[in-house]
């Protein structure tokens, strides 16, 4: 089995148990709260902070073109997209099962400005300089070809556009690093190598005119301007 297939199989398990995944991300279930505390060292306030910080670069009145990759179940972003009625939003994911959850959520919420595309972040099916914002929440630590993913997300972004989001970075919180190495990587949820705060800053500086990185425990939160 190729690494791509391993990751697809792992995320298929999550896609088929969307409520479990959503509970972990939003801390809305007991297991979600336990994992946030045990694995990530997060309490309620810190968990809310990384989400707020990652989404902060998106203006409240945004009416341009936005690409989210990967969309996952859409639990964090569909409520936002419903409010951005004037925006043209495209959501891409490698896992059809995860994306089905997002599609159902968008339909239930009446987010009619969102379309869904199955695809690979390492070979995005979009033309150059197509989007005003590219958003990526907790995806890069799972992508098999991170170099291609960084190149492609930059390629489809318009000059002056914003690339923002978050993902796991190593070296910030030892307990998280241990769980990632001994549990998340063997299960195929995360794929090494992983960035540090310093290596991520160097990488983004090489691609963008301006880049900012800060952390909430092991969440590396970034905002870049092309």
Where are these regions (language model features)?
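A generic alpha-to-beta junction signature in SAM-dependent methyltransferases
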Residues: 58-60, 83-84, 157
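Class I SAM-dependent methyltransferase SAM/SAH-binding core
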Residues: 65-123
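Short N-terminal helix/helix-N-cap motif within the alpha/beta-hydrolase-1
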Residues: 97, 144-148
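A short acidic, Gly/Pro-enriched loop at the edge of an enzyme's catalytic core
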Residues: 122-133
